[in-house]
Each structure stands twice: as C-alpha cells, then as structure tokens.
Curated annotation (Swiss-Prot):
Organism whose genome encodes this protein: Trypanosoma brucei rhodesiense
Taxonomic placement: Eukaryota, Discoba, Euglenozoa, Kinetoplastea, Metakinetoplastina
Presence of the UniProt keyword Cell wall biogenesis/degradation in the record: no
Pfam families assigned: Trypan_glycop_C
InterPro entries according to UniProt: Variant_surf_glycoprt_trypan_C (IPR019609)
Protein name: Variant surface glycoprotein 7
Amino acid sequence: SEPTMSTRVQQATSCVLLIIGCTNYAASKQQTENNAVCDTPCKCLGRLAVQKAYLEGALEHARQSIKAFASSSRQHTIAAGATNTKLSGHHPNQGRRGRRRSSSARPNNSKGNSPSKRAGGAVRGETPASGRLKAAKLLKSSNYETATFTPTEMTIQNRRACEQVDESKEYRFDELNFDKEQGIPTPALTLEISMGCQKNPGDTGGACDGTNADDGVVTKLTFTTAAPVAETSPLVAGAYKKTSKASLSISNRTEEGRVANSKAAHEAAKRLMAIKQPSDLSTYTDDSSFALLVGQLAMKPPLGAELTPALRDQVNKFITDNYGANEGDFRSKFLAKTEQAAVFYLDGKSKKTKKISELESKSELVTASGYAFFKGIHTEQAEKVENPRSQGNPETAENKKEGGNTAKPFCSTIQNQTECEGVKGTPPTGKAKVCGWIEGKCQDSSFLLSKQFALSVVSAAFAALLF
C-alpha cells in the first residue's frame, strides 16, 4: 500500500543522513526526474519540493516567535546561557526531524505558514494582569526557541561515490541534489549542521532583533571530516552552533496561544524595564507588573495563576518588609545595600564579580540581573535552624556559638503568627525579626533572604539599563 505522509517523512529523515549532495545542483532537470520517480523517500532520497515545504512550515513559527519577543530575548540570552536552569523542554517528534531551511528559502506567509492560520492550543480571554505575569515567566520559561542536536550513528551505504563532492564545501539546503544512486563515499565524512537566528541579509547582519521582516532562522549544511560534536543553544543568540552526525529537532510551537503569550511577555517586559526614577520606591510599588514579579519570585504561585487577594496582601507585606514603608526607608535600607551588593556577571564566557554600583556596560547589567534571577530563585534555605528542645544544654541554643553566630530557635514548631513574630533573639543578617510568618506558617526569616537578594539585583539592574 502507499506509505502515509508521516511514514514518508520518517523514512526520508532516516535516509537523509546516509547521502551526500553533488555540486551539480543546477541540473534542475535531474532534480525534477528524481522527484517524479519518488515511489518511496528512501528510493529517490530527494523530493526537495516536499521537504522544503515541510521545512518552511516547521520553522515559520520560530521566526514569528523570535520576532515577537526578540529584544527581550536578546537582552537575556547571555544570562540564560550562564545558568544550569533548563530553559526549554523539547519533545522531539520523529515525523518532524530533519526539517530545516536556508537563508534563501524564506517562508511565505501567503502559503498558510503563518501561526495565525494554524489550529490548536489557542488561549483566549487573558486579563491584563495575566499578561503582565508573562514578564516574570519570560526570564525563565520555555519561550526560547532552541535547536536540539542529537548525535546519531551513520550507516555507510555500498553505493557509488559522488566524484564531484568537495568535502569542505558548504551547501545551502536548496542547493543539495540528492541522487538516488549516491551514498557516503567515506566513513570519515560527516554532515555538519550550523544554525542561528540572523538579521537580514543572512549571516552578515548580526543577531536577530525583530526589526526586519526577513530576520529569521538560518541553517547551513557542511560536509566535513570534522570530529563529531553536539550542542544546544538558543537560536536568538545569533551565533551559529554546529553539530555533526546528527539530526535536527525543533520544538513545535505553532499554536496561537504560545505566540500570543510571547507577545504579551515581550510587552510586559518592556514595561518592567521602563523605570525612570530607580531611587524612588514609588517607581516600583506603583507598577502592578512589579508586584506580579515579586509574587512570582517570592511567593511562587502556580505558573499562570492570578494574584488572589490573600496572595496580593502577602506580596504587599513582602514589599513593605524588604523594600521599606516609605522613600526614606527604601533609600537608606534597601537601595544603599543593593548598590554595595556583589553580583556575578559575564565577561565573554568568564564569570566575574562586581558591586552593583560598579557595573558599567549594558552587557554586565543584563548578565548580572539574569544570573541573580535564575540562581536566586532556586537557592534553598542557606542555614538550618536548631530545635529549641536542646536549650537545656548550656552548650546549645542561645549559649552555643559556631563561628560567632548565635544558633536560632526552631521557628517552624510555632503555630501562632503573633508568637512567631514575637520570638526574641538575634535575627539573621538583613532581617528585622528572628522568625517570620511566611506563606501561612512560621519560618526562619532568612528563608526568603536569597529571594530578596535576587529581587534586589534584578530591580537595580533593570533600572540601570535605562542609563
């Protein structure tokens, strides 16, 4: 029976790495003949028209998505690369492997490749607050289009070698002429895929910034004898990433809801960074987006959840406790400490340390904010408190010294908020109380210290971006 299109695509994917292209790609007549006799993809190994159509459809959503939040993505790409946080969850689909397009094979929206014309997964009726929450998620969500290259073994076919192949020559996808009689002439020859998101024209204009309709994903194929490598990188980085002996999988983000959410995140992020007076508390507290970001960082509601009245009260209390109740408190207690805080930033590939007040270039500010955000929100409680039942021993509890620090009471055993906040003793550095009523229970008040520090770095760096 006639193979299904899905079967054809899978067969073509498994076969495409077994072949090489000849330089006589100008022989359009031969390509046409190959397509005409394509009983099965593995027989003719070509059918470029079909492959290119799938290719353009698979990657059009990537171009659209990148354009939707390119400026924000560009600002956070380096910071994202500095973390161990998994930015993108990929679910490779065998039926979509091997689909890639060249710089000369731009998608044509008139052919139905636009995400707005695709069905499925639409998320509608979002409130403005929900849209602003996307700003927080943008920095650590799966909104990065990532090309994942998976190394695979190549099987050498006992077929006539293509005498015209130049092993170091680079080919565009549409230049390859897949000849059904040709296989890989040498086990050392590998297919190298290089991919990046580039400004028009092609690979000479730098990284995508979403300002040109022709910006998009660019793919190069090179036949080489280079050693196998495999990498994963955000396409928005601009720089090409290479792999060999590999197939290419692109995350499928064609649903309208993903595109809409990405646009909302982009707009929300721009509002968050539009801070005019970084030394004024009202600059932050008057912005509902900032409260949403605090809630996402400190209170950790489920992704996509709105701030309920109870949660909003907790957020407001957290802001008052950590940022100050008035302008004077904010400047003397919070801003002064923030400016003196030491943070990590990236200088090229090296991780370095500076005080926030000494960060100079926009790159330093962006990487510092991203590093603090990604690392800070995942930091566990740094120091465990001790059980107050050990107070009977003069060598423990309040009398016990370790490195000059007084041991703390076991806050989590206290069930009453008033009693919790009234515990006497030496509070953790930077905190007003020993214990705090946090997320509906009594906890060591240093519990949110790392989150507050991360938040302070993010706030200061965002503000400084404007200067």
